[in-house]
């Protein structure tokens, strides 16, 4: 039996996001959930789902910036999909899929007594939301997709696999820090080193032996092995179309390799009612650490929630 993955209780990226564990799915595996604000007071909750190997730390700045704009009590739910962050790993690598994660989301919302919500998903998290819309459209009051669409860019999948594999063999802070900064700088050019370090430590930590450890199930890396740079993946437009029953906003980071520009443009053609934004000078995941990038999401939430009229 594989050794359980360890997440340090004092890991800085997660320390400000206390989580409760909800047991969901056929295997009854625990999922970590953080709730900011107050559920059940009539406000439409926001539920945030991170990318492929990411966790709720990617949403910390969104929560920080949204609170004074929406009100401190507005409920924002962050969660770690299974195999990520503080959630349990799935028993088998073959059990990982967007459909399984969507089924878990249904159970999570039921456990939290959430009947409808505005969902925000980055990368793979957005694909989970499309699967959720196909499975339970009544849950979707609105959706925000960030670097997410009906098809992933194979270049991004290969880059992610190569990057994560390269990191696994590095030992010692002296070697790790420059390598992590160099990798992160490709997505966030011009960012100070301290912030590059903070971004890197959202998905990894350095153990007592000086080795970099992932805050996700290493089996997720192996699932990326079949992909090549020149692969042309099949677009699942029927899943994207499942979002048609509710308002939609789409965002793409300028430097992303997860969502091709031509795919984003086709998404805009198919949903002419949807707002679309480009986040300048960033790759994936979107940092959402400035009011300029967060304000469109806040405005979307207000319109969907009925607290502000559409333009």
Task: Give the positions of each predicted feature.
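Catalytic histidine-centered segment of alpha/beta-hydrolase-like enzymes
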Residues: 282-294
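Conserved serine/cysteine hydrolase catalytic core
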Residues: 207-269
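Conserved hydrolase catalytic core segment
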Residues: 115-156
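Conserved HGGG/HGGXW glycine-rich cap/lid loop of the alpha/beta-hydrolase fold
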Residues: 36-89
């Amino acid at each position: 039996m594989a050794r359980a993955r360890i997440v340090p209780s004092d890991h800085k990226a997660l320390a400000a996001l206390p989580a409760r564990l909800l047991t969901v799915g056929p295997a009854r595996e625990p999922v970590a959930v953080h709730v900011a604000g107050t559920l059940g007071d009539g406000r439409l909750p926001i539920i945030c789902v991170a990318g492929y190997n990411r966790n709720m730390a990617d949403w910390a700045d969104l929560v920080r910036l949204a609170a004074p704009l929406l009100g401190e009590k507005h409920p924002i739910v962050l969660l770690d999909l299974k195999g990520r962050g503080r959630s349990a790993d799935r028993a088998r690598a073959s059990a990982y899929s967007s459909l399984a994660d969507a089924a878990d989301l249904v159970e999570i919302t039921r456990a939290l007594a959430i009947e409808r919500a505005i969902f925000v998903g980055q990368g793979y998290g957005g694909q989970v939301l499309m699967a959720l819309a196909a499975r339970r459209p009544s849950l979707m009051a609105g959706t925000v997709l960030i670097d997410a669409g009906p098809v992933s860019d194979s270049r991004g999948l290969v880059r992610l696999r190569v990057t994560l594999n390269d990191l696994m063999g590095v030992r010692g802070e002296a070697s790790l820090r420059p390598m992590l900064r160099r990798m992160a700088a490709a997505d966030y050019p011009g960012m100070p080193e301290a912030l590059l370090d903070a971004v890197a430590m959202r998905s990894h930590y350095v153990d007592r032996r000086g080795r970099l450890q992932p805050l996700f199930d290493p089996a997720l890396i192996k699932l990326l092995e079949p992909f090549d740079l020149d692969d042309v993946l099949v677009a699942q437009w029927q899943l994207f179309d499942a979002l048609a029953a509710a308002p939609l906003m789409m965002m793409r980071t300028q430097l992303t390799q997860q969502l091709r520009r031509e795919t984003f443009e086709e998404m805009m053609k198919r949903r002419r009612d949807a707002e679309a934004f480009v986040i300048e000078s960033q790759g994936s995941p979107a940092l959402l650490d400035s009011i300029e990038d967060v304000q469109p999401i806040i405005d979307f939430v207000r319109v969907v929630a009925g607290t502000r009229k559409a333009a």
